[in-house]
A protein has these predicted regions:
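Extended, low-polarity segments enriched in aliphatic/aromatic residues
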Residues: 1-196
Length: 196
């Protein structure tokens, strides 16, 4: 685990159940955003930026997202893949009809099925890799039991993300100005205790 304590929206404390509804989309940092990544929505907006800078490496960010799912689990996950998003999502993607609706109590297995539908290898999706590190998801999609076949919904020419590398720096080889900017952004976005 990389994170043990989370700031989250307070109304969850009074909820009888949490139902996580998401769209199946490509994502620049995570390869795909689906059930696991969508739970990041429970983090307040101002804190999201702080977490993005604190966990700027894609695998660290994915591990934090898995920590969040374990700390504040939803009881049901629903993926709207009637129309998904392909290309450079989530901001520069394009709508793509897929034609299915998926649901599960297990977000990690659900994400693996969704990755299979869009032809994205699980190894390219940090949240799936992070879940597999903790044995929350099987290594092979064939180990997942489903009520109806998902294979008819495979989109063979789905356009996946072109670049899922770390957006702040690439393997530590960023230009000097990029490293300096990264340090400034980290300092500005990180919370520090203070005396009032």
């Amino acid at each position: 685990a990389v994170a043990h304590d989370f700031k989250y929206t307070a109304y969850l404390d009074d909820a009888d159940a949490v139902i996580n509804c998401c769209k199946l989309k490509t994502h620049g940092m995570m390869g795909m955003t689906c059930a696991v990544k969508n739970m990041y929505g429970i983090v307040p907006g101002s804190v999201k930026s702080e977490y993005h800078y604190r966990y700027s490496n894609p695998m660290d960010f994915a591990r934090m997202i898995v920590d969040l799912n374990l700390a504040r689990p939803a009881q049901l996950h629903i993926v709207d893949a009637v129309v998904g998003m392909e290309g450079n999502g989530p901001t520069a993607g394009t709508p793509r009809p897929i034609g299915c609706l998926l649901a599960s109590c297990n977000p990690y297995r659900l994400d693996m099925i969704c990755a299979g539908i869009i032809g994205l290898p699980p190894a390219c999706i940090p949240t799936i890799a992070a879940a597999q590190e903790r044995a929350l998801s099987p290594k092979e999609i064939g180990e997942i039991t489903v009520s109806d076949p998902w294979q008819p919904y495979i989109v063979p020419d789905f356009k996946n993300i072109r670049n899922a590398e770390n957006l702040l720096h690439q393997d530590g080889n960023a230009a000097i100005w990029g490293k300096a900017l990264n340090r400034l952004l980290r300092a500005a976005m990180s919370s520090r205790p203070g005396v009032q």
